[in-house]
Every structure is written in structure tokens, then in C-alpha cells.
Amino acid sequence: MSSLDEGLKQMSQQEYRNEEQNQEGNQEDLNNQNDHNLNNNELDSLSSPPSDNYNEEEFEQEDDIKPDIKIYQNASQNNISQTQRISQTQLPQQQGGGGKRNSSLLQKEHYHQKNQEIIQKLMEKKKKEQEEKEKKELKLKKREDKLRKRMLEEAAKIREQKEVNLESQTEQSDHSNVTKSKKLKFKSVQDIYQLVVIQGKYQREQLTDKQQQELNEFESRLNEEKTTIIKMQQVYRSRQITFLEELKKKQEKKKQEEEQQKLKQEKIQTKLREQYENVNSNLYAETELFKQKKQEITKVSTQKQLVRASSAEGDKEKDDKKDIAKKIQQKNQEYIEKLKEKKRQEIAKEEEEKKKKEQLKEKMKDFVLVNIKKDIENGVFFVDVPEKKPKKEKKKNESKEDNIQITSPKLNSTKSLSSQITRKTNDAKKVEKLPKIKDSNKENHSKERNEDNEEGDDGEYECDEGDEGASDGEDEDDGNGSAIKRKLRKYPFITDLELWKKKQRLPADIKVFIVTGGYHDISKALKKRGWIANPDTKSPCYNFRWSLQTKDIDYENLKDFQIVNHFQKSACITTKVGLCKSLRNLVWHENVDIDTFYPRCFDLNDTEDFENFVEEFKSSKAESILKRYMRMYFEKDPDIEKIKKQAVIAFNVCERKMKELDEIIDDPNSIQLITKKEWNILSADELTEEKLAQKKYEQWLERIEGKNKQKPKKKKKKSKKDKQQGDTEKKEEEEGEAEDEEEDEEDEEEEEKQMDEFTLKVHQILKRYKVKYPQDCLTGEDNVWIIKPAGLSRGRGITCYNNLVEILDHVKSKESQWVIQKYIENPLIIKKRKFDIRVWILVTDWNPLTIWHYTDCYVRFSVDDYDTENLQNKFTHLTNNMVSKLKQRDEKDDITELGSMYFKENFINYLKEKEGYDVFTDKIEPQIVRAIIMSLKSVQDNIENRKNSIEMYGYDFMVDDLYNTWLIEINSSPSMEYSTPVTERLVKAVSEDIVKVVIDYGMEKSKKARKNIETGAFKRIYKGKYVEEKTNVVGLNLICEGVALKKGKKNSNVAKVNNLKPNFS
């Protein structure tokens, strides 16, 4: 080895030994100090005073028993000498045993005093020594870590140098022929190393004692180096494994990027092909038009040439044509006169027929009246079939024709009776048998249908509430296989579906539906499947009904085969109050804490809930003050002393809240969590009633005086949330990758050491809050709560407050039912905006509970940037589409182009770019599915189940900055309007998929066929077990009466039971 290698080696070994010696010395000091310290039991035994029969010789023997305790022994000897002097000088000599007793009492008292002083000193020393121990141990741990790192680095270097030197020395040793067996004299360590290299050629007996010692030392060093090398190998292997894993991940990322690029290129190529085909098709069309124009021009030119050639012959032909025209006019005049005479004769005949009909009316009055009354009682009505007339005649005779439907006939008036009689007599044959239409009349029928469509009757009935008239044109066979389209009529008195179909002359197998409330896509999907719409929206004749509200459905008269889109008593989940109360019953069904997915909510009209809210508001106020205190501490804000008083009381409140139930029950002062004095200090920064009244008065003056004009726009201050996110993004750009978790823990430990006692306690209790309360992340520094009216929707009447006085004033001033919920103060923000997620759910049965989840959800954004300073601005805190419609954003981006909404794909891609993995499918979507199942399980016993009933719900979720999803509310009959491009695409798809699930899948009886039926984007996420319905025992009074059986005698037969007379009622 070279001199440089030896120096490095020796330096590393010496440092390692010195550190080990220091550690051993520190440990020996600690052990010595521990030997000097006394246990509490030993101190109690030593501090006990001597008995009444006390002698100095016995005391000296006790001192000899414990020679190890030097400090206490010296002190005890001094005490003995002092007591002896006192006894010799002060006390007189007394006879008998009385003098000995008095001296022993004095010695006891003096001995007690000295012992107590020594014990206090020893206990103080103990505390100091323990603190020094802990400090030294931490220092030793840090030094050990540093030394290990250095040793590993130096061992790696030594190993590399050794390998090089060994290779060079092995080559030299092969050339040298060492065969002498003389005793060697080693001048340096190199000779020893060479001797070790040449193994087996020297014997130990030939070496001196010093050489053997050096060899042994060197071999021990080699063994140590080998151990270090083995450790280094393990370290390098672990690093190599991690390096290989990182390489694999990078390669997979590259492959994914390449695949994405390929997909993009393929999409671009397909777009280019489509464009190319469109261009070719346009060019082809233009060329054909050009050819047609050429041909027309050539025809015109040839015609002009022919006209010029025959101009001479044309003059003669013109004269002949004039003569022929005169003759034709004469004949036409004669024909017109004949027609006029025929019309006069027809008019005279019609007048005669009218007179005859009037005579018949008078004769048939009594007979017809009786028949009409019977028909009205039976619900049978006759319908006019209008004759086919051209468009002009229809317009003239619209006023003369009677209405198609007879709704309320006036039996008392003679005019109405006469009109009904004429209908009976003239059109009875038409009602019974329709005339067969021949093939020659098909064209006329189609023309008339087109004319009717031009006038306004499109042949399609929009199923909205309040619409009246005929329904869709239905096809009817004319006997020859051709279809005729006609309009359905309304029969309000018919309740039987089969009878209704007979009246409409429809086949018995056809299905009928009613759709109201603007769900046009559902009606289109049903028409594709051959269903027919009933024009009367209030009619009970249907197979399937989809309505906006439950009150449109008559549940008492429903039949088993009729399908309806609402369940009874579903308000327990679709209203804000119902959801708040029903989720508390989830404990009876599942062992789940609702605080993990539903922000805490209270009904302010319930006195118990109101009191709980006030207490919760005050405790969350204390928590927000502590969080503000810690932020100011880390930012080194000089105003932290102003909050110190509030922080101390807030800490006491939080510490009280963290106590367990057993401690609270035993504590007599645990009735109030916060006293009035404490709350006055905590709410020092809030409004009082006087300040609130003054604020309202100023607002009223501004409205009157017109001071609320548009002021010049100021630059918005960044909210605390935006500042924190901006700072974190800058730090990530500057620093690159974050530090390891171990380093973060070390930093936290160092910060905790630097904190004073109070801040350390605050820091620890906030940590405990995070562990115990899952909604700790929702409370920030502002303590914001959101108030919602229980009966309204679409963002109406919703306000945010962070002041208890304002909340109470808001609730008292307006008479309605209010619900208050904890506002999420740490929402996930996308491009400076707040958002929520709308998810559609379909429940097809409650026993067993079957839930269908529509996987294609969408995201709704607020209009303005997120800011907690202005809580009254709806455009920053609400994401409802009805609110965002009222304002347009100045800045345009991909969100505003889609109407302040996002598709699911856009949301997933944004989170992938931000986090590097699919956060939605891995973390957010499973939480959404869990919350849906748990919320519906909580209401399973409250909603009235009915087979062939379904219901669609709209779930609203929010996501916080830790990617925790929170259920906000559940809506019945969610909106299906084409408000934005996002909803237009999704509503069309959802309505088609609803029909697939309810009609195609639900009406199929065979299980094998169901497996092959498509359900679109709907996926069944849960199907529970069937629960047998309990028998209704309520209202029965069961009584059992009789006589008890008695034991017979030994020799008697079986006891008779004739006296037992049961009476059940």
C-alpha cells in the first residue's frame, strides 16, 4: 500500500475509535451518576427517624451497611456529630431511662430536618441529570449517524484503492522467488502486508513476538474492513434496486407518452382524412354544377338559333292561335253559366234537407236524450271523424265544425241538445265503421298531412304540463297493409287501459307512456321502441309515467304493472333537513362515522340541534384561533401577543373538549364547554348586536341615497388559500423535489425544541385534533358556516357567515325552516375557482336495495375567483348553474367556453398533470361510491317500497385540498336542460340509458337474456339482500282465556281438559 492510503486508513480508524471512547466515557459518567442517585424507596428507608430505643452504635452500623452512597453517608455522619454535641452541651444528665428518651427525641427532629433538605437537593440533581442525559443521548445519536455516513464513504474509497494495490502486488509476487526460511525483520507495515499476501510461505514460529502482534492487529483490521465492505455491498445493492425501479418507472412513463403521441397522431390523421374527403366531395359537387350550367347554356343558345330561323313562320302561327283562344273563351263562359245553375239547385236541395232534419229533431228529442244520459253515465263518447277537405275549405269551415271531444255537455239547454242530436244522426255510421281508403287516395292523404303540419300541428305531442290537444300521429292499417297517421283523442272518464286502447282503435300489445316536465329525450327513446304517448297527462291509462313531482302520481289507484319514477316519502333524503336527520340513523345499519363524508349539519328549528350548533360554533371558533396563532408564530408576526389572551382560553376550551366521556361525567363543572366570560374574550373580534344594527342602518342609507353605484374596480387581494398555493408552487419550482420524510420529522423536532411551552402545547393539541376529529381539516382561521333554506333549491336563499350574532339575526328575521352546515374552508381550487361534482344515481328497488351509478359525471365551477374575504358574493361561493348564468366572466378560458363546466375527462386530465397519477379513479371515485351507498342505506326503512317504481337522484359532492370528498346534498328530479354544451351531450346520453335500464333490462324476465342487455354508462354498484316484510300486528287485540291444568292423582287417568275454553278476539 502507498503512504497516502495508509494515512487515510489510519485517520478513519482513529476517528472511529475516539468517538467510541467518547461514547463509552459518556456512558460511564451516566452510570456513575445513576449509582450516586437514590431510588425513592431507598430515600424513604434512610429518611425514617431512629426508634425510641436509639443508640449511637446502631446508627454507625447502619452507616457501614451502605458504603456506596457517599453523599448521603457524609451528610449522615455530620448530623450524628452535631447531635452528639448538642446532647453533651445542652441536655443535662438524667438518671434512669428518661434522659435517654429526651435526647433521642431531639435527635429525631434534627435528623428529619436535615434529611428533608438532602432529599430536595438530590431530587433537583436527579431532574438536571435526566435532562442532561436526554440532551447527550440526542447528540450521540446525531454523531453516530454522521460517523456512519463518513465511515461508509471512506470504506468505499479504501476498498477501491485496495483492489488496485492487490492486483499490482500479486503480479510482483509471482515474479519474485522467495524460498529462504530465515527469520525476517520487518521494518514497516508494508512488509507485514507483503507477508500476508504471500500466504503459507512463512511460519509463525519464524516471526518475533512484535511481528506476530503487528500481524494480529493487521488481521483484525482486515476483518473490520471486510465487515465494512459487506455493509457497503448491502447499501449499494439497495441503491441499485431503487435505481432499477426508477428506471423502470421512467421507461413506463416514456412508453405511455409515446402511446399518447401515437393516439394524437392517429387522431390528427383521421381529421386530415376527413377534411380531405370533404374537400374532394365539395370539388366534385362544384364540377357537376359547372357541367349542368354548361349544358343549360348550350340548350339556350340552340333554342335562340331555332327561334331566329323560324321567325318568319312564327307570324302566321300567332294569328291562328288568337282565333283559337277566342273560341275557347266562349266555351268557358257557357260552362261557367251551367255550373252556376247547378250550384243554385244544390243550395235549394240543402235547404229542403235542413227543413226535414229540423222536423226529425223535434220528433227524436225524447229518445235521444235518454240514450245520451246513459252514455255519459257509462263514460262512452262519440268522436267526429272530419271529412277530407282542401286547405282553403278547412279555414272557412273551422268555425262551423264542432269540437272533437265532448267534455261537459249542458243537458238543460236546447241548443246544445240539438247539436248533439245532429252528431248522433249524421255521424253514427262514421263512428261505427270507417270507410276504406283506396290506393288512389294515398297521395291526397299525404298532401293533407303535410298541409296540417304547415298549419302548426306537427304530428308530435310535446309532453309538457298544461299542453292540451291531440297526441302524436299514430299509424293505422287501412286493410291493404298501408299505414295511415291519425291523432289520438282524450278520454278523461276512462280509467281502464284496455278500454282506452279499444276506444283509440289500438292493438292490445302496444305500450303507452306519459312524460311531463321537459324530459323530451326520454319520450324520444320510448318512441324508438314503438311506445305511444297518451295526450292526456292526467289520465290513469299508461304503462310508464315520468313526471317532475310526486304529486302528479295517484298512488292509491296505481296498478301493479304501471311503472312510475318516484317513491313515496322520499323527502327524508331529498330535502336538506331530511338528509341531515336520516344520516344520523346510519349507525343502526352500518358501523360508519358520517363525519368522514358529510360535513356536520344542524336543523335550527329544532331546539336541541340549535343548542348543539351554538356549542359547536364556539368550539370551532376556539380551534380557528389556535390555528391563527400557530400561523402567526411560524410567520413571526409581531401582532401575536395581541391574540395571546384569546389563544390561552381557546387552548383550555379545546383541552376540555378532548376529554373522554368518563372524565366529563365525573367532573361536576363539565356542564358548560365555554363560559360566558370565556366567550366574551373569544368573540372580541366579532360583531355585537349594536354594531350589527349600525351596519344595517348604513346599508339602508346607502340604498336610499344611491351610494351603491358601481365603484372603480380594485385589484382583488389574494386570499390566504391562493397565497399558500402560490408559495408552494414557487418553492416546488425553485427546490425541485421535496425532502424525505425523515428530514421533515427532524425539522419538526427541532422546531418543537425551539418553541416555548405554550406554543408546544398548542401544536400538540392540534395534532391530537387531526387524529380524533376527521373534520378538523374543514375548519380554518375564519370559522365560516353556510345557511340554507330547507325548502328551496338552485342556490336560492343561501348565505355564508362567520359571526354568531349575524347568524342568529338572519334566522330570526325570516320565518322559514333553516339548516346550517360547516363550510369547507380548504376546497380544492382549479384555476382559482371553486367547484363541485354532480353525479346521477338511479334506484330501481329498495328491497333488495339496488343502486345504479352513472359513471359519466360532470364538474360545475363558480364564476368569480375563490376569496374568503367577501362572504356575501354568491358568484365566488356557489356553483349552481342558475347562479352562474346571471354573470359572465371577463377572462375567457376552457372553463368559460364550456359554460363554467368540465367534462369528467377534462377533470381527470387536470389532476393527472398536477399530481402525476389518476387521482379521480384511485381516490375520489371510491369515496363517492361509498357515500352514495351509505346515504341510501340510512333511508332504507323510511321510504315506502313499491315494485315497478324507480327514482333518479342528483348527488352533489365537493373535494378538499387533501382529495377528501364530501357529500353536500341530494336532489330529486335533477335538471335535464340543455344549459351548456356539457349538459346537452350528457342529458341525451342519460335519458337513453335510463330507458335501457328500466325498460330493456328491467322488463326482461329471463336472467340469461339480461346478461346480454346493454345498460349504457349505468353500472350497478350495490345490490343488498332481500328482507322479508314483517306482518302488520298493529291494531290486533289478542286475548287467551282459560283454566290452568292440574296434576292428577297417582292412580287416576289422564287429566281431563274439558274446562279449557279459549276465546280469541
Curated annotation (Swiss-Prot):
GO terms for biological process: protein polyglycylation. It holds the Pfam family TTL. Residues 1-146, 158-182, 301-326, 341-360, 381-482, 708-755 are annotated as: Disordered. It is an enzyme of class 6 (ligase). The keyword Nucleotide-binding applies. Signal peptide: none annotated. Residues 23-53 have a biased composition (Low complexity). InterPro entries: TTL/TTLL_fam (IPR004344), TTLL_monoglycylase (IPR051437). Disruption phenotype: Cells lacking TTLL3A, TTLL3B, TTLL3C, TTLL3D, TTLL3E and TTLL3F display shortened axonemes that are resistant to paclitaxel, indicating that tubulin glycylation changes the lattice properties of axonemal microtubules. Axonemes are however normal at the ultrastructural level. Residues 54-63, 451-479, 734-754 have a biased composition (Acidic residues). ATP binds at residues 821-824, 834, 836. GO terms for cellular component: cilium; cytoplasm; microtubule cytoskeleton. Its EC number is 6.3.2.-. Residues 709-721 have a biased composition (Basic residues). Residues 633-1009 form the TTL domain. It is found in: Cell projection, Cilium; Cytoplasm, Cytoskeleton, Cilium axoneme. Residues 122-146, 313-326, 385-403, 424-450, 722-733 have a biased composition (Basic and acidic residues). Gene3D superfamilies: ATP-grasp fold, B domain (3.30.470.20). One of its GO terms (molecular function) is protein-glycine ligase activity, initiating. Residues 73-92, 166-179, 404-423 have a biased composition (Polar residues). It comes from the Eukaryota. The keyword Cytoplasm applies. Probable glycylase which modifies tubulin, generating side chains of glycine on the gamma-carboxyl groups of specific glutamate residues within the C-terminal tail of tubulin. This is Tubulin glycylase 3C. It comes from Tetrahymena thermophila (strain SB210).
